[in-house]
Amino acid sequence: MHTFIQILRSGMLGGLALLLLGCGPDQQELPWRQVQLAEVKLRVDFPCEPEVGRTKVDFGMGDGPVLVSMMGCDAVDSTYALSDWVLEDASRADEALAFWQAAALTKLKAVDGKNSKSGAPFIPDGAMALSRSIQATVEGEGPSGWVMTTHGVWFARQEGDSARIIHAVIYSPKPNHEVAQRFFGSLVLE
């Protein structure tokens, strides 16, 4: 599990990801299962049994490292993950999303699909209506020099004076917009 957390952390900080070889199945063939995140008050479907972990990450906002909770797993040729952390000042949530996106998307280019345009708003019911609540599909070079695709969404939920900052992502060898829509469409704030 330690290796998984290191890989996921690298992906968040530098847009790096695990790239596995193989051909992906249709989304119907993946064994989707619903996972409840009680602390986050969120449901999401994963195509594999996710591992969980926590690590401190400094997003460069001037607040120092924050404790990020992570959940993720590998299915066929892709890594699926969900991460979240609590920002004490909800008024800075849009800024936090911008910093996280900058850390994850640096040096990557957009790869739009028929029904998924990079930078399009992504605001699930119950999420804060923020300009940086978006969906993006980008392509870039992975840690071993291979081309990789990152499908990601960023959004926030207000919790009193705080905000929970949430990021869901798929790292894969090629774009798979249908599977990404299946994964992101399953995100439900309770």
Task: Please state what every model-predicted region is.
Residues 30-53:
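Post-signal peptide N-terminal segment of mature Sec-exported envelope proteins
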Residues 37-41, 75-79, 143-145:
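Glycine-centered tight beta-turn/hairpin loop motif at sheet-sheet or coil-to-beta transitions
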